[in-house]
Amino acid sequence: MKYKNSFFKIRIKEDGTYLDVFPPKEDGKRLDIREVVSFLEQKGFAGFSIDALRKTLDLLQEKPLQIKISDTCAKAFDESATIITGKDNMIAYIRFYPPSTGGKLMTEREIRAELEREKILYGILEPVMEKLKTTRTYCTNIPIAKGMAPMPAKDTVIEYFFNTKPLAKPKVLEDGSVDFHALNLFSAVNEGDKLAKLTPHDPGKPGMNIYGKTIPQNRPKIRKLKYGRNITLSEDGTLLTSNVNGNVTLAEGTVFVSDTY
């Protein structure tokens, strides 16, 4: 069995019951004594030495170690699992604990029943379920279900093909003098020139968490092309073009074209 995280297993012998502990490999995680104690207590073991268990875990390095936890032969028990969910309810992990000597592995039906008990209804990772038919990793959080995040909506985008923020600067004449009366407040435009292009909004798509609850997407900002005289709007409502030669300006979101310079 391939593994990285440290794990433990109950071994039942003729002279009593033992706990086998296996060291982590590479960058695997060490066992948390609280997890081991909680498991043993849930299985009905009492009277074992927590200090001895702690010392055993501290000594655990490259080879597995064994500690006796009871002088009696425990009744065999099957593999078990717990379900752990993320705070955002978008992912669920399954954490397996090995069967004792003589115990059985969980079946696919039992694993699915465990998910159902925890009300995990959406996003079960079938490739993981398939792998669990032949492979086990213990004391390790294995992703078993994932929610679907909402697809963000996108706002309408309007692109203008002229200077929408002209600078009110005086015009410099050929002789070097300055004409303060001729301020450049307009942009010249020719007949047929594109003035503005609209990219429609994308409504996005709602998501769903592992409990089957819909997650709404954000609301997009929807805009339309606004325009005055001397301008043509395309049939699909996405393009403005000038009908005349003149000046173009943008005022309060509306495009205006004047046929006089």
Regions found by a protein language model. Give the residues of each.
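Long, low-complexity, mixed-charge
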Residues: M1-Y261
